[in-house]
A protein has these predicted regions:
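Alpha-helical bundle segments that constitute or directly flank the non-heme di-iron/ferroxidase center
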Residues: 1-23, 48-55, 129
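Generic detector of short, locally flexible boundary/turn motifs and exposed helical patches
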Residues: 2-6, 56-58, 65-68, 99-101
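Hydrophobic packing residues in well-ordered alpha-helices of helical domains and bundles
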Residues: 4-12, 36, 87-94, 124-127, ...
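Short, contiguous alpha-helical
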Residues: 26-73, 110-146
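Residue-level recognition of alpha-helical structural elements
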Residues: 4, 32, 83, 87-90, ...
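Acidic/histidine-rich alpha-helical segments that form the ligand environment
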Residues: 8-11, 17-20, 73-112
Length: 146
């Protein structure tokens, strides 16, 4: 298994353990007005966005480009909706979106993987690049490892 595949598998194992969080832990503040559940909604959104980016690549042969400014705008616009999710739904959506993203990545032809590895888009393959900082953020908020 390639490194990104192994890292994604390990990340999914950690994400699945989020089901053990209590309601109080899901409501913990993570900073900037976000709760643990908000972070999970954010993670689910970006894994679903990843699927659309792969759809675009498959259809058009090019990646849908996003600048750092786009991410800031998306986060600002999405935070209210992510915060409104019932906490248990945020957990379920996060895990489901991550599983779908990893399944899509695992199904990519090796030639596509090779193309991505030559670009600054490695996060399209290795989801832990996005998940890991958020998992650390969650662990800090709840005061324990997941």
């Amino acid at each position: 298994m390639n490194d990104h595949g192994q890292h994604n598998r390990e990340g999914l194992e950690r994400l699945r353990r989020l089901t053990s969080l209590s309601d109080a832990e899901l409501a913990k503040d993570t900073g900037d007005g976000w709760t643990v559940a908000t972070v999970l909604g954010h993670m689910a959104f970006f894994d679903r966005l990843l699927l659309l980016r792969w759809d675009t690549y498959e259809k058009d042969g090019v990646f849908a480009e996003l600048t750092p400014n786009h991410f800031d705008l998306i986060n600002y616009a999405g935070a209210g909706d992510w915060s409104a999710l019932p906490p248990r739904a945020a957990v379920a959506r996060c895990i489901e979106a991550a599983e779908r993203a990893v399944a899509r990545i695992n199904a990519l032809p090796e030639k596509v993987v090779a193309v991505v590895l030559e670009t600054p888009r490695v996060a399209l393959l290795e989801r832990m690049l996005h998940w890991s900082p958020h998992l650390v953020q969650i662990e800090r908020a709840i005061g324990r490892e997941i």
